Structure formats: structure tokens, C-alpha cells
Design a protein with these regions (language model features):
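Intrinsically disordered, low-complexity regulatory regions
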Residues: 1-105
């Protein structure tokens, strides 16, 4: 039987993804996604905000979740990643100096 902790477990897993190895491998989310934004702009000529970049990653994960749900499957890793990207959005917002907002980056 499933327990109520299953929902909380994936939140903890996502937290560990973005604060553990991910943070060690890629560094602070603002620094990491500032590079992503620069590369994307160089390739496309389009300037993304920090929130745009992170929400784009959430969109990628949501599209993959939809594809799997249409096949009556739930891909756990993709779900954890989507939650993690939302956590990174929150972290980026809180890491930016006042009065900057995520949307202004």
C-alpha cells in the first residue's frame, strides 16, 4: 500500500538533486543559467530572462511527462527533474540582489 509520504519523498529527492551533485557540478543557479542565457542568445539572437530559461526547462520536462502519461506511464525521474527546476526558479529569485527580479535577468 502506498503511503502519504510518497508525495513528500519526491520533493526531498528533487531538493537533493538541486542542492547536492547538481550544485557541485554546475555551481550557483544564477551563475549557471546566466551562461545558458548567453549561449541561447548567441545561437538565436533572443534574450531570455532567468525565469524564461528555467521555465523553458520545466516545459521540456512537462512535455516529456505528457508523452509518458499518454502512454499511461509516469516517468519518476522526469517528474523529480521538473520539481527540481521549479525549486531552482525559487532559488534564483531569492539569490538575485534587490531590486532585481528573476524576470529582469
Amino acid at each position: 500500500m502506498k503511503t502519504e509520504s510518497v508525495g513528500a519523498d519526491i520533493l526531498l529527492e528533487a531538493h537533493q538533486l538541486v542542492t547536492g551533485p547538481r550544485n557541485n557540478d554546475y555551481g550557483n543557479v544564477v551563475d549557471d543559467y546566466s551562461k545558458v542565457i548567453q549561449i541561447f542568445e548567441g545561437l538565436t539572437g533572443i534574450r531570455m530572462s532567468m525565469s524564461d530559461a528555467l521555465l523553458f526547462m520545466v516545459s521540456v520536462k512537462m512535455a516529456r511527462l505528457r508523452t509518458n502519461l499518454e502512454k499511461n506511464r509516469l516517468h519518476h525521474d522526469t517528474l523529480a527533474d521538473a520539481i527540481g527546476y521549479l525549486g531552482l526558479l525559487n532559488q534564483a529569485y531569492n539569490d538575485l540582489p534587490y531590486p532585481s527580479t528573476v524576470a529582469e535577468r
